[in-house]
């Protein structure tokens, strides 16, 4: 059982590395056009669903606050994000990073590239197989979040 689990872990590690390498390669031209790094692109992706604080981004990226602050400053300078203060009922020291129209435009282009890649890679798989993989990944993702919140 342990050996079998180790094989799965090694496979997942290689899979994640392959996905990251492909993503970096396919997004390189777009990132160059917007003059941002892969890490800055990842921050924009995090902000796609909701505004976040620097602390929240730091936690999700697993790097130090200074590195995230530098990324955010560059994104602000590039007019891809802006700082927003919350309403008066919330701690005024909190500043939320939100996407600008230019940041949303970048993500729209990025998502189009990623959709094309996903379609090319999965075009010979039936929708049931894809849905089954997604369901398993959602269970694993939920467990990762639960595990992470308890450690």
Swiss-Prot record:
PROSITE patterns, A to Z: HTH_MARR_2
S-S pairs: none
UniProt DNA-binding region: 54-77
UniProt keyword Nuclease present: no
UniProt domain HTH marR-type: residue ranges: 1-142
Pfam families linked: MarR_2 (PF12802)
Record's keyword terms, sorted: DNA-binding, Repressor, Transcription, Transcription regulation
Highest taxon of the lineage: Bacteria
Annotated GO biological process: response to stress
MF (Gene Ontology): DNA binding; DNA-binding transcription factor activity
SUPFAM superfamilies in UniProt: Winged helix' DNA-binding domain
Chain's role: Involved in the antibiotic teicoplanin susceptibility. Inactivation of the tcaRAB operon leads to teicoplanin resistance.
Protein name per the record: HTH-type transcriptional regulator TcaR
Top-level taxonomy: Bacteria, Bacillati, Bacillota, Bacilli, Bacillales
Gene name of the encoded protein: tcaR
């Amino acid at each position: 059982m342990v050996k079998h689990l180790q094989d799965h872990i090694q496979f997942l590690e290689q899979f994640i590395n392959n996905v990251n390498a492909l993503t970096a390669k396919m997004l390189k031209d777009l990132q160059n056009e917007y003059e941002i790094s892969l890490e800055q692109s990842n921050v924009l992706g995090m902000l796609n669903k909701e505004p976040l604080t620097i602390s929240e981004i730091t936690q999700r990226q697993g790097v130090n606050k200074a590195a995230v602050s530098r990324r955010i400053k560059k994104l602000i300078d590039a007019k891809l994000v802006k700082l927003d203060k919350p309403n008066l009922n919330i701690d005024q020291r909190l500043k939320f990073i939100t996407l600008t129209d230019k940041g949303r435009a970048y993500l729209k282009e990025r998502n189009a590239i990623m959709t094309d890649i996903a379609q090319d890679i999965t075009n010979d798989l039936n929708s049931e197989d894809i849905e089954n993989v997604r369901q398993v990944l959602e269970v694993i993702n939920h467990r990762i979040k639960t595990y992470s919140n308890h450690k």
